[in-house]
Structure formats: C-alpha cells, structure tokens
C-alpha cells in the first residue's frame, strides 16, 4: 500500500504520535530497535537507551524521540537529530503490528510536517548493511516512498 493509505490506516487504528523524553521511553524504543536489528541483521544499535537519554538531556533542542503509541504502548518510532538546516533520522523501528498498520509511516510523516517550514531537508541516513557494502533495497524503498532520493558515498581505503 502507498504511504498515504498507511498513514490514514494508522490514524484509524488509533495510533498517536508523541514526542517522548523520559529514560524509560528511550529504553523501550532502543529495545524495539535492537529487536528489529538483531532479527534482521544480527547487530545492535550503537547507542543504549541511557546514552540516548543522556544525549537528549545534553541537547534537548536537537535530539528527539517521536513515538507511535497504540493502546498506551510504544509500537514504532524514530529518533531524530536536529541541525541548523537538516533533520536526520538516526534510528527508525517498528514492531510487526506497527508495520501492518503504518505506525512508523505516521511518525515519519509527523516529523516531515513538523520541520518542513524550518529545515532544508530530511536526511534518512544510509541504506546499507554488512559494513556499508550492500544496499538494503527494502529500506531504500521505504525512504523513497516519502520522496527521498538516493546518493552514493564513495568509500576509499588508504594503506599508510
């Protein structure tokens, strides 16, 4: 289904987006992120929930957790880093239910709408895996579904 249909479905299903700031919220989110990363890629997030909370506390105007909440439960969300002209999605995660009903789509749409007047662009980050060697086509398609475009980073190795 298209992004607009998924966003509408999430709303019909009772998903609401909240910007969360408590330690327990960051822990719940990173637990969800790690479940997804472990299941799909056998890796874990770079940050812990405690580290994300610390970053948020040190930079409250720049680090934000937008969570998709259904029946008082965090089912999806994104952590964004806000810069002068850019908003960067550092983490995005959704459980199975959230994927079915478009809960992450609603969170991303909320971020886009919040920043569209004040930022030049939204940086979805990389779409690669296995040491940044292989393109994750599903992740790339998700980002392109929001109007994102791909760019190529060249990787150079110098033997010194």
Language-model segments: residues:
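Active-site/acyl-donor-binding loops of N-acyltransferases
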Residues: 119-160
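Conserved acetyl-CoA-binding loop-helix of GNAT-fold acetyltransferases
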Residues: 99-113
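Short, contiguous acidic/charged loop-to-helix segments that flank catalytic cores in large enzymes
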Residues: 94-102, 128-133
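A conserved beta-strand-loop-helix scaffold within acyl/acetyltransferase catalytic domains
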Residues: 1-98, 115
């Amino acid at each position: 289904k298209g992004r607009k249909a998924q966003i509408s479905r999430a709303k019909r299903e009772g998903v609401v987006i909240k910007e969360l700031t408590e330690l327990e919220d960051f822990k719940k989110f990173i637990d969800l992120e790690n479940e997804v990363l472990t299941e799909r890629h056998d890796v874990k997030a770079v940050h812990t929930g405690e580290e994300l909370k610390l970053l948020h506390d040190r930079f409250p105007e720049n680090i934000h957790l937008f969570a998709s909440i259904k029946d008082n439960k965090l089912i999806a969300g994104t952590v964004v880093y806000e810069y002068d002209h850019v908003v960067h999605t550092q983490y995005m995660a959704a459980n199975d239910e959230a994927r079915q009903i478009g809960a992450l789509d609603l969170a991303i749409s909320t971020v886009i709408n919040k920043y569209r007047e004040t930022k030049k662009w939204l940086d979805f980050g990389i779409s690669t895996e296995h040491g940044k060697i292989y393109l994750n086509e599903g992740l790339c398609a998700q980002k392109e579904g929001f109007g994102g475009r791909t760019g190529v980073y060249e990787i150079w190795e110098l033997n010194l």
